[in-house]
Structures are given as structure tokens and as C-alpha cells.
Swiss-Prot record:
Other remarks on this protein: Despite having conserved helicase domains, this subunit does not have helicase activity.
Protein's name according to its UniProt entry: ATP-dependent helicase/deoxyribonuclease subunit B
A Pfam family per the record: ADDB_N
InterPro entries: ADDB_N, DNA_helicase_suAddB, DNA_helicase_UvrD-like_C, P-loop_NTPase, PDDEXK-like_dom_sf, PDDEXK_AddAB-type
Source species of the chain: Staphylococcus carnosus (strain TM300)
GO biological process, one term: double-strand break repair via homologous recombination
Transmembrane region(s): none
Residues at which [4Fe-4S] cluster binds: 785, 1112, 1115, 1121
SUPFAM superfamilies: P-loop containing nucleoside triphosphate hydrolases
Amino acid sequence: MSQLNAYIGRAGTGKSHAMLDEIKTKMKQDPLGDPIIIIAPTQSTFQLEQDFVKDPELNGSLRTEVLHFERLSHRIFQEIGGLTEEYASKGALEMMIFDILQSHRSELNLYQSQTKYYGFSAKLSEQIQDFKKYAVSPEQLEQFISENPLQTRTQDKLHDIALVYRHLEERLADNFVSSEDTLYKFIEKMDESKWLKRAEIYIDGFHNFSTLEYQIIEKLAQCAKSVSILLTTNGDKDPFSLFRKTSSTLTHIEEIAQRQNIDFNLRRFTKQERFENRDLSHLEHSFNEVFFDKAAAEGNINILETSNVREEVNAIARDIIRKAREENIRFQDVAVLYRDETYAHLMESVFPEFDIPFNIDTKKSMTHHPVMEMIRSLLEVIESKWSFEPLMRLFKTQVLTKKFKDNRYLTDILENYVLERGIYGQRWLDDKYFKIEQFNLMGLKRQPMTEETEADYQRVIDLKNYVIDKILRFEKALAEADTAETYAAAFYEAFEQFNLPSQLMTERDELDLAGEHQQAEELDQVWNGFIQTLDDLATVFGNREMTQKRFLELFDVGLEQLEFVMIPQTLDQVSIGSMDLAKVDNKKHIYMLGMNDGTMPQAISNSGLISDDEKKYFQEETQLELSPTADVLQMDEAFVCYIAMTRASTHVTFSYSLMGLNNDDKEVSPFIQNIRDLYTNLDVLNVQYAAQHNPLTVMEHPHQTKIALFEELQSWLNHELTAETWLEAYQAMLHNERLSRGLQYLTSALTFDNKTIQLNQSLSKALYGDKINASVSRFEGYQQCPFKHYTSHGLRLNERTKYKLENFDLGDIFHSVLKYIADKIHGDFRNLTDASIRKLTQEALENILPEVQYNLLNSSAYYRYMSVRIGAIVQSTLTALKYQGTFSKFRPQAFEKSFRKNPKSNEQLAAESLYTSQGISINIRGQIDRIDTFNSKDRSFVNIIDYKSSGYSGTLDLTKVYYGLQMQMMTYMDVVLQNKERLNLAETTEPGGLLYFHVHEPRVNFANWAEMDEDKRQEELLKSFKLNGLINSDPEVLDAEDTRLEPKFKSDIVPIDVGAKGNLNKSSKVADSQTIYKFIEHNKNNFIQIASDIMDGHTQVAPMKYKQKLPCEYCNYRSVCHVDGMIDSKKYRTVDESINPIDLLNQESDEDDEE
């Protein structure tokens, strides 16, 4: 007759030890006797098997098997058969559920909008799996819905879940089984197993069971010779006791024995056997007790406090290294337990820095592995009709481009080119877009093509063709398929043609030979996961017809759930795991990280589809049990802590931090205070405080010691108090060949000041030439920051250009369109009519827009809309130009007038050369948007008009002019005055105005829109185009700028405001001609000074600060110069904003006259 036994006792009382001793004794007495089965959680099976393997008297076992529930069922089916259905993996089930959601979307009441999300099918799969574990069928769900009054949302929710659940069961019926279905069939077939009837079964490592597992235990108790269950409980069945969970499990086991009329034997374990000292015994015995006696701690329990999470992990790593060195412990004797996933990620990066071997007992998603990323990108390329982003991701995985040397470099060139040309869709297949000559036109600064660059461009084209050919073959194979099976076959055959299987296996072997066993294993699992997903699709959906889109969606769902299952790479390594899941029994040293409130105890929340209230109501009405609710789980938090800390036999270290990764404040766990209260002398060790008083505690590993040394030496250089130990450590490491490696790089960072080297004159000439031919903007760029000039014109770094409309593109368009129209009407805007404005605008745009960025403005609906907006802006601009011309005596004389030292035609203007202090010529070139002139008797006056599409840049700031940050307008005026004969101007030609015209889309704001009429609106629109800049204060010039000037008149076309007495108000922007000439002369001196500095080789990172702003904010070279306010602020040049530039120039002029 069967027996049901329960081994109960507190943690460390020897339950598992007694079980193993019993089994080993039986094995020694009769090695080939009746089977012995140990059922344990998956995480524990390897450890239990090792117990038998390591026993020298056994050397393994033929009689005893360590299995989890699912493996036991497979073992029985191997014996008796009966499982004819195909096994449906987790991925297969999720694919089925996703397909059901799409097929029955219209029948859903609540979740229609969620069906398109892959994550929702995973969530629904979890909920259905939960129902199966607790023996709830779709019929029971539907019955509950029909028989009970429910809130509408709850009713709709359960209806949708039941609907999907029922359809899933129908698809599985007679064809497939899930893991839960396998266990139900196992229960049905258990009676037929002769092997099981002879077996003695031990169940260890569990604290509670699901309804399905209880049913298995009940059936095992009926069939097997004996069943013994080990539980960590003292038998206290108080619902609020520490052992609530396991005592509840014990009650269920007793009910099974009573229900089946089976002998039930309770064996209590009371003697502590695990703990090697009184500290841990007292901790286990008194934790969570209301009444306890305090004990004196003997140093086997530590509590560490750190400032932040990273330092907490570093402190634990240092302690492990110290114990390994001083106490001669092995890494396999150490376990680190955490609750917050943040710690797992940190340990993965920190522990290798300390050379600590470790194994983290978690499953990682395969999603981000390069091979998986390549597969998913390939799917997205097909689904998105060859979009840029997935295609470039495909290239960047380097999986399909392994055969190309420097494939990353070639991919970068390809990406730059494709970004600039806007290659997408079918353009990838058009050879005219991928010619070597086209590649050489790439970028803003084009360089002559060398043989080497030509060869590189050819390799880029070859690489692109190689990958595109593979995608085309893959796309063609999919296009010929129409069922799940044919799609899966096409998929695999395409990858076979890619030679991918052999490539990956070769790579795996190379990784193994190089000692990178984990990476090799990951590669293996990724490929097997890929094949498994294809098999699942072919098996589950078979010959069912489906669209390519549906197949790719289902395939992506399958890939999404793939996870790595990594086995330990060595036996001597630190075990790392979650406090909730890790099975780490009898470790000598346990570290419990993250002992903060909110983590331990954790604020439990229900993340499932069904809320806790819905669960409780369901359980009350149906008398069926479901998975525990959040409030029940919350009651077990002390038990989680208890189980974790009692895994240690020698030492426990608790740690917590005062700040999280996001600098959020953290509170210590209340359990820490509870633990401290158990002892008379258990203090908290602040790691930072301890390190300050004894720096040697930080010096456990060379790499980490160097980092800490760097921080301490930095404090020392800043005249902060530093322990002598650090300076001694520095000297010791400096003179040790092994320890000094890398030290120089760290110490050089201490004195790093981002200082550049001044070029010698020969190198300057090699970079810039023996004369400077440059635009005005180049000199302005140097004045903003010398290093910016060095990178752009010395190193000639080429910033990436993109296939999109930039601000400078808009400016070029407006310049070209206005030049085209001005030439058509011979510069006379006054006679334009609304009809002629519309006609000329359309004609100009039709001629000019197709030339912009490879016809960018016709590439999409958005850019076609932008073309319409550009046309509207041009029409508004022409209306404003007509209005301004009507009231001005100045007439346009030239448009887009270029200038240089040696004009190539009579159309160009000549610019006199300047000379640096080294005698090098400065030849300035550029283009003046518009030159307006006014002739009066024997004098001519000149207006320089510059079109700006940015309102910010369309302001003449005389302070910036003085400092050489704004040199354009004075340069243009100087060039025009030099060329009065070429422009047929009078012998006496003087400045009229230096004015900016803001080309923009006008917007009108009214305080009271009810009072607005069309005339007022038009008036405000025209006023928004008012010219801005500086005007000659000569009365004749003022009258010519606006013929309507009179007292109390403020011009709406130029910056002139006349007062009541005919004088100019302060808001007028005017200066006499002598002042303008002084600015022109000062501007020339700025050119000479800047050019001289350039040829002297100045390259320093020294941006000029103006109005609390640095040019770095919009600089494209920040990633090159590494400008840092902490390091470089002392080198910033600052504009004196208190100066009056006009007064300062006049003062300098007076001083020159006195000399």
C-alpha cells in the first residue's frame, strides 16, 4: 500500500540531507533496485545530480533519477506510449493565440485594439496557461460569465479570454498538446506505468504547488510505492505566520492523504545542522518572531551601506575577492541574491572587471543577438517595402557581409550615401543610383577621387549588390509560397542558399577554439531557435493558406519569445540569482543585495489580465483555486527573505544603497532593522566611510584599484585631503611592471586640459596653402572657435548630409527663385501685379525645384506640400518687394553679384587682396544678393540687401561686427565701393544702407480679431518684411530710403523713426558715413588678424561666448573637440557686451590721429 510522507522543519534542519542519505543508503545496498525519483524545480536538478556524481562511493546513479514534473511525464510516456499528439512549444502557442486574435478580432468585446500588438498575445498566453495550471477550463469560464452578475468591463474581459481559450483548445484537440496538457495526460496514463508503481518518489525544493501539480501528487500517491514531500515549515498553520505558504501546502497534502485513504507520516526535523556558527542559528530562529532574546554578534553577519547601486555591487565584488584570497574560499561556495533586475545587469558588467567567474540564473531574450537582429530586420525589409531603417540595420549586423574585409567601414560609407540621396524602395535596385561617380559627389566638401577611394566605392557597390541579391532571392522565394509549410520551406532554403548555416557553424567553432564558449553556445541556440520557430509554424499551421504578411507576423511572434538557456561554463563560479527563484542551498557565503524598502519587502502588484478582485470573486463563486493574489503574496515577503538568508552555512552579508541609478533616494528595508534588533552589537558599515579610514579595503583588484586611485589623485590635485596610502599605492603600482599597465592613461586624464597643439608655419601652409582663398563665413567660423575652423578647413572633416530639406537649402531656393524672377523683370518690382506674381512664382519654381537635392521636393507628399508653402512665401515676398520699391528712390541694380580677386568675367566684381602679418595674401570671395543704388547729382549711394530665411540671422549686430563675428555686410559694402566703375556709379559713391530682408511666411497677431479687416491684415503682413540693419544718416539718403518721411512718421520699410520735431528717434538704426567707413576698415583689420592667426597655426578649443551663449550649441564638431565646461571654461573668449561699438571705433580713431 502507498505511503505519503512529509518531512517538515525550519530551514537548515537537515531535511534534504536526510533525503539524500536515505537514497544513497538504498543505492549502496541495492544499486539496481526499484527506481528512486527526485522531483525538483528545474533550477535545482543540476545541483542534485552533482551530489550523486561527486559521491566517490556512487560515481553517479543508475537507480535514481532527478526530474522535474514535465520530464517525469516524458519518462512515463517513453515507457507506455500514449502521447500521439505533437508538442506545442511556448512559441507555437503564442503564434496560435496571435492568429486566433487576428481571425476573431470582430468577436472580441474589450481587446479589439490590442490584437495587433505581439506582447498582448504573450500576455494572453500567460493567462490561459495560468488557468490550465489551476484546472480552469473555457467551459467553466463561460459558465461563470453566464451565471454571475459582472461589471461590463469584467464581463467583456472574461468573454474575450474564454473565446480565445476555447478556440485554442479546439486547435490543440487531437493534434497538439501544451506542457500543461501533457501533464493532464500523464495523470490519465499514470496507472499504466509498471516502473512508476515500483518507484519511491521524493519531492524537494518546492514551497507551494498549483492545482495541476497537486493532482499529479495525488495520483503519484495512489500509484507509487511511496511519496515523500519536503517542506520548510515548523507546522504552524496560523495564516499570519512566517510559514503561511508552506503550512498551507502541508494542509493540502494532508487532505490528499485523507481523501485517498493513504497512510500519512509526518516527520519533524528540529535540530539545526546547516549553520556553522551561533550568529546564523540565532538569525534563523529569531527572524520575524515577536518575542526573542538578543544575542551578541560574532562577526558572521555584515550589513553594508553604500551611496549608490553601482558602488554596492563594487563593494560586494571586492568582498568576494578578499574572501577568496584571505579565507581561501572557492567561488562555488558563494551566492549573490538580488530582487531588483538592475543588480543583475550591473553584476554582468562589474564582476568581469574583478575577474570573478559567475553564472546568472536568468533567461535572456535572443532578440538583440546579431543573427536574430538580421533575421528580424530582413522580415521588416520585406514588410516595409525596402525602407531605409530596417535595411541599414540588416547591413550593420554584419551577418550577411562577413566575407567583405572592413565591412563595417564599407557599410558606413553606404549609409552616408543612401542618407544623402534618399535611397528607398525600388531605388535600391536601380544601378543609376549606385555609380562610382555618384559616390564621389557625396558630402558638402568634395575631394578629388584617388585610386584608393575609387576602389573603396567599388567595394561598397559590390557589398550592396551582394546583400540586395540575397534579399531579392529571399523575396522571390516567399512570393512563390502560399501556405505556412511552403513559406517555412522557402525561408530555410533561402538561408541555405545564403550559406548561412555553414557560416554560423564555422563561426561557432572559431569561438570555441578562442575560448569564447558562451558566445559559441549562444550562436548555437540562436540557430536552433530559428529552426524551431520554422518547424513550429510548419507543424501548427501546415498547409493552411495565408498571406505573406500574416506568415511574417506569426514568425516574428515566434522569434520574440526565444530565450537563451545558459548552462554554467565552469563548476567553480559564483551563483547569482533572484531571491524568488534561485535554488542555492548550503552555500557558505550568501550576499543579499538591494535590501531597500520597496524591494525587500516588495510592493507586490498584479500584472496579469485578471485583477485580484476579479480573481477573488471567481474563487468565491466557483470554489476553484487560482494563482495567489497580490495581498497573499505580500504576506509571504518575510518568508522570501527568510529562505534567502538561510541558504548560507557560514556567513551572510546584507547590503543596501541610499540612491538608485536615477539618483532617486532609497530607504533601507525594515527587515534590516529587524535583523539588527536581534543582536546587541550588529552595526551598519558605511562602505565610503570605511574606505576613507582604511583605503586598503578598496584595493582588492588592480583594475578597480586604478579607478579608485584616479578619483583620489584627482581630489589630491584639487587640494582636498587624501590619505597617504593612496600616494604610496600610486608609487608602488608605478614601479611594478604588471600593475603599471594602463596607469599612464588614467593619470594623464588627471591633467587633461583639452589643449591642442599650435601648428608650425610649414604645416599650416601644407594644410591651408600659401594663400588664403576663402568666403566671409570661413573667417566668421574661426572667430567663433579656432578649433572649428581647424576641423572644417584644416582637417576638412565632412559632416554627413541627409536627404532632407535643411535651412540652408531653403535659403538657396529663395535666392535662386528671387534671382530668376528679378532677371525676368529687369529688377523692377514696382509694376508687378497679383497675376504676374503668381505666374512668375510658378515658372521659377518649375525651373529651380527639380534641381534641389536630386528632386527632393517631389519625393513625398510632405515635400510636395513644402513646395506649395515655398511658393506662398515667394508670393508674399514679391508683394513686399513691390511695396518697398514704391516708396524708395533706391533701385535694384544687380542681383546675385559674385566677387573674387580675379574676376572670370565682366559680370563679377573684383575684391582687393589683403595680407597677413606673414605676407600671405587673403583673397576673399562671395556673392552679394542684391545691390540697390540711388544717384543724386554727382553722388551715388549704395544699399546692400541680403536675403535671410532665418529671422535670427537677419539682424545687424554692431558688437558682433566689431568682434569679427559678423563680417558679411561690411565686406559686401567695401567690395561694391571698390567696384564703382564696374557698376557705372559716380566717382563719389558712398554707403547708403546695409540691410537684411527677411524672407519668411508672415503671420499676423491681433489683440482683437473682431476689429481686423483685409486692409489692416495686409498692412501688418507688409510691415513684417521691414528691412533691418544700418543706414547712412545723411538726410539725402534718409529721404531716398523712404519718400514718405515726415515728423511723427515711423517707416514700415526701413529702420527709421522720425520724431515730432523732425529729428530721428533712438529706435532709428543710423550712423554717419564716416562711422560706416570706420567699421569697414575695422572689418579689414579683423580679416588680417584672423588670417594671421590661422597661418600661425592656432587650433585651440576656445569658443567665443556672447549673450551667455556658446557657438558650440549648434556646432557640428562637438564630438571631435570634446568641449567641456568643467575643463575648457577658462579658455572661453568672452564678448564685452557693455561696449558701444560706434563710440569705441571713434575713440580708437581719435587715438590714431593723435599718434
